[in-house]
Structures are given as structure tokens and as C-alpha cells.
């Protein structure tokens, strides 16, 4: 890596940061050599009802898997985000909210948020929610989404937040798997000037005959839009809040008690319920938020992620609020009604720290930097990137146009499963290289292995694994521990397999190269190819489908589908559009195929396995060096697919 591509930490930033390079090296070394001692100390950053004495009981042996942190302590996550700030910071603003329409704005102090959470926790109890129950949350980006999450945590209920862009079928599958008794939703949400029919989607999901556990649907009135109503099942949020008491004693929870479920795409097609527990997760979310973003008290912090994703959980709700931060929540998209919106909001709310995704940066880049001519940006101090590897061009644009060349960029790598950031620069410690996630956070031991599981030393490329546990790690796949072991610990014995490939350069910096399994990263969100294939094949005119990712200028990866139609079906543009809408309805807008190529046949081995590496290369327009096709049952299929490919650049 040439020195011109190295962005040095400025002396001023290093002098004022929580951690400089020397301190990073000392702390990191201690966290690896003496993890018990390191986490014994740093676990104290949150409040415990019963202090822990036991720190770490972990093993990645697939026959004796164990992940336990602070496991004899007790605490409450909601109390850590609210109650502990009341004595000194009750009047500090916890949430600044800006609606899809900028004229709608609210500020909520820690004292006010505490009262709202207590009231809603009591409201949940009035609807029969008890400790250990799973509550599904399908909400727009409004403060009440955070209130609902924290209220669940307060009474020991387990929340399962479903992204507001998911379809009724996707909601139903998650409700069925989690056996939810109560769903919290809104009449509608607002996004990009459009009303999103959240309540209608819930109604449709609950028509699924396999949904049998739901007793109550609590509905927030957001837009006042007309909704259908089911008596004895549906209840208005505001009606419950009118009579609810303003104090609710937080439940004392074991450190290893479940805090939330969050469903993520897997390569098998069935979304898997990632289970996070309370103690280790809260320690890790709060610590990474403070150190990675170099957070200082009183700063306004804006994470643009939706609450339905892990980034929204860890870095919009639990991490920042545990640290007493002022969090900006935006209901809409930061490039509506114009690309200038992002800059306007940073200036309007004096944002110090911005955490966003490469897909938004690329979208703004495509619109042109003239939209930032009036952008001041002087409040901005730190910028982050999350969701997928950021390409160097987008990194530089972000640095120059949004950061005015003075804000460090923390390009963070982590996963739903990891609970928090694992590989990242620290603003005062790490010289950065555009496109590299750089170095591991404290306590994180990444390694590269070949396909046989042999550790690769030095400058190299391979499968990214982790050699030991960290407090924020998921504990299991809900209801399917065997799948958890199989997915993450069987591929490479004694190691956690991330599913990502990476290379390590001459400076020891990590560069994430993308998924090595059948998962596509669309706009920073993971989609299993099997999930999209299943949706396509469920259409009566589709005989077979194979889905791969391909390079997309805005989204990072687009969805490229190869579809074989039933015999005698005509290949028309109308049918292509019908299939796109079909997938959209089955899964959600995020899963809509960008390109659908008609295929008379797919490249298969004699045993019937589809050889996806050929399909990926054709979709990426890399057709000159496809490699050995001799194992295919019908090698001629490849030529036909190349001839009719849709992603040509010539």
C-alpha cells in the first residue's frame, strides 16, 4: 500500500482522543494476554445489581461449545440506558427526532424517556406480557421504537424487531419462529414522502394460518391513516399510555438472560433468530460506542441505520444510551427530498459523529457534490461506515465532501452475530487506508485460514475466523442450537467462522473481501440467495432459479437471478416485471431482483449441484476466464448463458 493512500492520525486528534496508538497497543495486548483481568475491569463500565465475580467461561469446541460472560452477575439493560443517568443528567436530551418531513421535530430528555419507558412497560404488563415472553416490534423510525425496546428490556421480555421494509410473509415467519404473543406496530410509517402501511402488513401476516400465538397488537398512531381494526386483539398505544403508571421497577436479570432476538439471513433460506443476552452485550455495545467513535459527553451522535437492523440496536439504542449520549433519530432517508438533506441535518442539529453506510455515500456521490455547496459541517468530528466494505473512491468522497478532509473515518466491520464492532480504526490511534477496516478492537482475535483450516501468517488472504470469544457475541440460534454450532463452529474446528473472506496487508491491516457463502450484501443488508430463489420458484411459471450477487454502483451488490421457466412458457418483459413484483411481495423491496436472465438450463455437476462460481462470474461480466467447466453435466450451458447475459459493458 503506497504511502499516498495512508491517512495519518493528526497530532491534535491523537492528543485529545480517548486512545492514541501507544495506548491502543498496550490495551490490546492486555486484552489478549489477560482477557479475564481486562474484562473484569471494563465490565464495571455498566451498572450491576449483583456484581459479577466470574468473568469468562468460553469454548469454541463444537462438541463442548460455551459462551458465558460475567455470568454470575445481574443487571437490567433499561436501567443502564436510563435510570443511571437521572441523578445528574435527567435534563440532558436523550433523543432528537426529525420526521420524514423536516417540519416535524421532537426532543426527549433522559427524564422524559425514563417516564415513557416505565409507562409503556406497565402497559405491556397490562396486556399480559411477562418476563421471558417474545414481543415482535414492527415500527417506523420514531422514538416510540426505542421506547418499546427499552420497555421490553425493563420487564425482562425479549424483543424481536422486524425491519419495516419486510413483507407480511417475512413478518409471519419471524412471528411463528419466535411464538410472539404481542406485536407492537404503527398505523403507518413515513419514508421518502410515502406512507408505509405497517398495520396492514401486520394484518396480512396474521392471516397466515400458522400464526397461532398472537393475542394482542398494540398500534401507535403515527399518521392517522385509516386502518382495519380487530376488536379484542388490536389496542391503541395512546389508550394504554393514558392509564399507565409512570414508574416501573426494572426486573433483575441474569447476565446471560436473553435481551433480544434479531433475525438475519442464512444460506439455507430460513431466517435465523440470532439471540443476544444482557450483560456481555451491554458491556460490549457501550464500550465500542465510546472508544470507536471517541464519544465525549454532550455530543450529538447520528446513526442513520434503521432500528430493524443490528446497527440500530447497538449503535442507535443500547450503546449510545448506556453512555448517556444525545442520539439523533431520523424517520426518513437522508437523501430525501433532496441529496442536500444529510448535510442540512448535520448542520441543523450540530451533529458531532455520523455513522452511515457505503450505499448512501455512493448514492450521494452519484448525485454530485454540488448538493453540499451550502453545507457547513463544522460540528462534525468523527465519521463512520458500516454494513459492507467501503470502496476507496467512496471513502475519499466521504472524507473530502462530508468530512472536509479533517474528520477521521472509522470503517467498521462486524455482524448481527457479533453484537458490536470487531475490526475498526480508532480515531486517535489508527492511520487509515481507504477500504480497510484496519485492526481488531480490544479482546478480538481475528485470523485467516485456508480451506483446510490452517492458519495463514503475515501478508495473506483467506477465510476470516475469530479464535476466541468476546462479550457481545451471540449465544445461539433461537430454537436451533444445532444450527448455531453447524453454521459457525463446524467449518473450522475450534474457531468462529465469520462467513467472510479477508486479506491482511504488510501492516497487519484487514481488508474484507466479501461473503464466501451464499449470502448477498445488498445496501449493507444481508439476504440469503436461497430465500430469493425460494420466492422465485414459488411462482407457478418458474421451474428453477439461481440467484447470485453482482457488483452494483450504488448498492454494493445487486441481485442477479437466472430463471428457467416451465415448459411452453413465453419469455416476456411483462413476466420479468411480474417476477420482480412477486419477490418483492414475498420477501420485501430489498430482495427485488435487479436483473432477471432467462436460462434454458443452469450449470450443474453430474450430481445436480449448481456451480455458482460460473453464475457469479457471468453476472459480473467476467467471462474471459471462467475456469474449468469439465465437471459440468452440460458445459454448453455456459456458452448460452454468456451469450444472453444482461450485465454487458461493451
UniProtKB/Swiss-Prot annotation:
The keyword Transcription regulation does not apply. Its EC number is 6.2.1.1. GO terms for molecular function: acetate-CoA ligase activity; AMP binding; ATP binding; metal ion binding. GO terms for biological process: acetyl-CoA biosynthetic process from acetate. Acetylated. Deacetylation by the SIR2-homolog deacetylase activates the enzyme. InterPro entries: Ac_CoA_lig, ACAS_N, AMP-bd_C, AMP-bd_C_sf, AMP-binding_CS, AMP-dep_synth/lig_dom, ANL_N_sf. It comes from the Bacteria. PROSITE patterns: AMP_BINDING. Its cofactor is Mg(2+). Keywords: Acetylation, ATP-binding, Ligase, Magnesium, Metal-binding, Nucleotide-binding. It catalyses: acetate + ATP + CoA = acetyl-CoA + AMP + diphosphate. Coiled coil: none annotated. CoA binds at residues 191-194, 311, 335, 523, 584. Mg(2+) binds at residues 537, 539, 542. Catalyzes the conversion of acetate into acetyl-CoA (AcCoA), an essential intermediate at the junction of anabolic and catabolic pathways. AcsA undergoes a two-step reaction. In the first half reaction, AcsA combines acetate with ATP to form acetyl-adenylate (AcAMP) intermediate. In the second half reaction, it can then transfer the acetyl group from AcAMP to the sulfhydryl group of CoA, forming the product AcCoA. Belongs to the ATP-dependent AMP-binding enzyme family. This is Acetyl-coenzyme A synthetase. It comes from Shewanella baltica (strain OS195). The gene is acsA.
Amino acid at each position: 500500500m503506497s504511502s499516498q493512500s495512508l491517512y495519518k492520525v493528526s497530532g491534535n486528534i491523537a492528543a485529545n482522543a480517548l486512545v492514541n496508538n501507544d495506548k491502543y497497543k498496550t490495551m490490546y495486548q492486555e486484552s489478549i494476554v489477560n482477557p479475564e483481568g481486562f474484562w473484569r475491569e471494563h465490565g464495571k463500565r455498566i451498572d450491576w445489581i449483583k456484581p459479577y465475580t466470574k468473568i469468562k467461561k468460553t469454548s469454541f469446541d463444537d462438541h463442548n461449545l460455551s459462551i458465558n460472560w460475567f455470568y454470575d452477575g445481574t443487571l437490567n439493560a433499561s436501567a443502564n440506558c436510563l435510570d443511571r443517568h437521572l441523578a445528574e443528567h435527567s435534563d440532558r436530551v436523550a433523543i432528537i427526532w426529525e420526521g420524514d418531513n423536516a417540519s416535524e421535530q421532537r426532543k426527549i430528555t433522559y427524564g422524559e424517556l425514563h417516564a415513557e419507558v416505565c409507562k409503556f412497560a406497565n402497559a405491556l404488563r397490562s396486556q399480559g406480557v411477562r418476563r421471558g415472553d417474545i414481543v415482535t416490534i414492527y415500527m417506523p423510525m420514531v422514538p416510540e421504537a426505542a421506547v418499546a425496546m427499552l420497555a421490553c428490556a425493563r420487564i425482562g421480555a425479549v424483543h424481536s424487531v422486524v425491519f419495516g421494509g419486510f413483507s407480511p410473509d417475512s413478518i409471519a415467519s419471524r412471528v411463528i419462529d419466535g411464538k410472539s404473543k404481542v406485536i407492537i406496530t404503527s398505523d403507518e410509517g413515513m419514508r421518502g414522502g410515502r406512507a408505509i402501511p405497517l398495520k396492514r402488513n401486520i394484518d396480512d401476516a396474521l392471516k397466515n394460518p400458522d400464526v397461532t400465538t398472537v393475542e394482542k397488537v398494540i398500534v401507535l398512531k403515527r399518521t392517522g391513516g385509516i386502518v382495519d381494526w380487530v376488536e379484542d386483539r388490536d389496542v391503541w398505544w395512546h389508550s394504554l399510555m393514558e392509564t399507565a403508571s409512570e414508574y416501573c421497577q426494572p426486573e433483575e436479570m441474569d447476565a446471560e438472560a436473553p435481551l433480544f432476538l434479531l433475525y438475519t439471513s442464512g444460506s439455507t433460506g430460513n431466517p435465523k433468530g440470532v439471540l443476544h443476552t444482557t450483560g456481555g452485550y451491554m458491556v460490549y455495545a457501550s464500550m465500542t460506542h465510546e472508544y470507536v467513535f471517541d464519544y465525549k459527553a454532550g455530543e450529538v451522535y447520528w446513526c442513520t441505520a434503521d432500528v430493524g437492523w443490528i446497527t440500530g440496536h447497538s449503535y442507535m439504542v443500547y450503546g449510545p444510551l448506556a453512555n448517556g449520549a444525545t442520539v439523533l433519530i431520523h424517520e426518513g432517508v437522508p437523501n430525501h427530498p433532496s441529496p442536500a438533506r444529510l448535510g442540512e441535518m448535520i448542520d441543523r442539529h450540530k451533529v458531532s459523529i455520523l455513522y452511515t453506510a457505503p450505499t448512501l455515500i455512493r448514492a450521494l456521490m452519484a448525485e454530485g457534490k454540488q448538493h453540499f455547496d451550502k453545507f457547513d459541517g463544522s460540528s462534525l468530528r468523527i465519521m463512520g461506515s458500516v454494513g459492507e466494505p467501503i470502496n476507496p473512491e467512496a471513502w475519499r468522497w466521504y472524507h473530502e465532501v462530508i468530512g472536509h478532509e479533517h474528520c477521521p473515518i472509522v470503517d467498521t466491520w462486524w455482524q448481527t452475530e457479533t453484537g458490536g464492532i470487531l475490526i475498526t480504526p480508532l480515531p486517535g490511534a489508527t492511520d487509515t487506508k481507504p477500504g480497510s477496516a484496519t485492526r481488531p478492537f480490544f479482546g478480538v482475535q481475528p485470523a485467516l485460514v485456508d480451506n483446510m483450516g490452517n492458519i495463514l501468517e503475515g501478508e495473506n488472504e483467506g477465510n476470516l475466523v475469530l479464535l476466541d470469544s468476546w462479550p457481545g457475541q451471540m449465544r445461539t440460534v433461537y430454537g436451533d442450537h444445532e444450527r448455531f454450532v453447524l453454521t459457525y463452529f463446524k467449518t473450522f474446528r475450534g474457531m468462529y467462522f465469520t462467513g467472510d473472506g479477508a486479506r491482511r496487508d504488510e501492516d497487519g491491516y484487514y481488508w474484507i473481501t466479501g461473503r464466501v457463502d451464499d449470502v448477498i450484501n445488498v445496501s449493507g443488508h444481508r439476504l440469503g440467495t436461497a430465500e430469493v430463489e425460494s420466492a422465485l420458484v414459488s411462482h407457478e411459471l418458474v421451474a428453477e432459479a439461481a440467484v447470485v450477487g453482482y457488483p452494483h454502483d450504488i448498492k454494493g451488490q445487486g441481485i442477479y437471478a437466472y430463471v428457467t421457466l416451465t415448459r411452453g412458457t413465453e419469455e416476456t418483459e411483462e413476466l420479468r416485471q411480474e417476477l420482480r413484483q412477486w419477490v418483492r411481495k414475498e420477501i420485501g423491496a430489498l430482495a427485488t431482483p435487479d436483473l432477471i436472465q432467462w436460462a434454458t438450463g443452469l450449470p450443474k455437476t453430474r450430481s445436480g449441484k449448481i456451480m455458482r462460481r460460473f453464475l457469479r462470474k457471468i453476472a459480473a461480466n467476467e467471462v474471459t476466464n471462467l475456469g474449468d467447466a469439465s465437471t459440468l453435466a452440460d458445459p454448453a450451458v455456459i456458452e448460452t448463458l454468456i451469450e444472453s447475459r444482461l450485465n454487458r459493458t461493451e
